[in-house]
Amino acid sequence: MIPFLNRAVNFSKRTALISNGKSFTYQDLIDQSDMVASNLLNSKKDLKEARVAFIVPPSFEYTAIQWGIWKAGGIAVPLCVLHPLPSLRYVLEDTQSETLIIHPDYWELLEPIFKELALDFIPLTNILKPFRKAILPDIDLSRRAMILYTSGTTSKPKGVVTTHANIE
């Protein structure tokens, strides 16, 4: 397990974040991110740094998805909810994302690329559904955790890779 995620257990009853006027504890975040990880893994043992993109507004779900991707061994690729379709397509193609988790508010925006890109498109509601808890892989701090995109002042945006050690 990733050390900072392990530390969340020590604060399980404390408020982790407030989203849409509702408080969520670290335990809520642990439980929901375990569910996300289990759904992503399905019958696999480790995502082995597969890129998992997600387009979700800032919320409890955003954090649970990001943590769940990490717990499953994937690389989180957060997409900006304000970007137009061509920019989103560019990031998905550039990162070679295998999966895209989509909040219902962005389904219509992304629908035109469903047939064009070889991605597993997962509605947010599906990834948050209860699933048998998987045995989560051990994640070394040297593994890649996230790809964030810069604003691209000289051309197209550039992906910046962050490891778990960088986040720690």
Region spans (language model):
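Conserved ATP-dependent adenylate/AMP-binding module captured primarily in the ANL superfamily
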Residues: 81-112, 130-131
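Conserved pre-ATP/AMP-binding loop-to-beta segment of ANL
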Residues: 131-149, 155-156, 166
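AMP-dependent adenylate-forming
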Residues: 3-25, 43
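Conserved S/T- and glycine-rich ATP-binding loop of Class I adenylate-forming
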Residues: 52, 69, 100, 144, ...
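Short beta-strand elements of ligand-binding domains
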Residues: 56, 79-80, 102-103, 118-128
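Conserved structural elements of the adenylate-forming
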Residues: 30-38, 160-168
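Conserved AMP-binding/adenylate-forming
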Residues: 22, 37-83
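Active-site charged/polar residues at nucleotide-handling catalytic sites that mediate phosphoryl
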Residues: 47, 94-96, 117
